[in-house]
Amino acid sequence: MNSDLALLRLLQLASPGLPVGGFTYSQGLEWAVEAGWVRGVDGFVAWQREQVHDTLACLDWPVLARLYHACQAEDAAAFGHWSRFLLANRETAELRLEEQQRGAALARLLDGWQLGQAPAWRASLELSQLGGMAWLAAHWAIPLRQLALGHGFAWLEGAVMAGVKLVPFGQQAAQTLLRDLGNELPAALDQALGLGDDQLGGGLPLLAIASSRHETQYTRLFRS
């Protein structure tokens, strides 16, 4: 696939229109706002910056890279291992369910395109959205770095749009946040791609607590 088509496919994978329900989850932010842990734009920036440099850089991106390389090598066993590793590192039932729901939705999209149907791959593809993204990126010859940045921006955009509704703040502030927090993604990715297998894993206790409390939050805008 030429570079222009690879770019278009990347934009498709990173699009908020991808039918995986990306904008239906707040990943604990809804409870954090209600509890007063996140107040105003500055509080939101601090909350998301921790996730960029912990969850994204120390877990999601390194695992995405390993899933991508497993697809390139046609190593279904390694792909399954890292898919399960990612799911095991989601610290709450809510976060694990979100991961599986996104993965199943993307797997159904692959079914519609008659892709990823081999039994050795199909079950693992349902475990996470990252698995489906890695599989499609390898299939479409999207470079790993571009894939990771596209995924990171899509994740950040989803978080900022949740912040618009919950914190709240306006669209001007939202775009400024996307610009400023987005500036931190390339350096965080450099760190992520340099980690060894024994260095992978993130842990944000307040995020885990917020996600757990969100499961039983009385009134919610976002899915649990």
From Swiss-Prot:
Record's keyword terms, sorted: Chaperone, Cytoplasm, Nickel insertion
Record GO terms (molecular function): nickel cation binding
Family assignment from sequence similarity: Belongs to the UreF family.
Compartmental location: Cytoplasm
HAMAP family: UreF
UniProt keyword Translocase present: no
Lineage: Bacteria, Pseudomonadati, Pseudomonadota, Gammaproteobacteria, Pseudomonadales
Protein name in UniProt: Urease accessory protein UreF
Domain of life where this protein originates: Bacteria
InterPro entries in the record: UreF, UreF_sf
Gene source species: Pseudomonas putida (strain GB-1)
Functional note: Required for maturation of urease via the functional incorporation of the urease nickel metallocenter.
UniProt xrefs under Gene3D superfamilies: Urease accessory protein UreF (1.10.4190.10)
One Gene Ontology CC term in the entry: cytoplasm
Chaperone among keywords: yes
Oligomer status and interactors: UreD, UreF and UreG form a complex that acts as a GTP-hydrolysis-dependent molecular chaperone, activating the urease apoprotein by helping to assemble the nickel containing metallocenter of UreC. The UreE protein probably delivers the nickel.
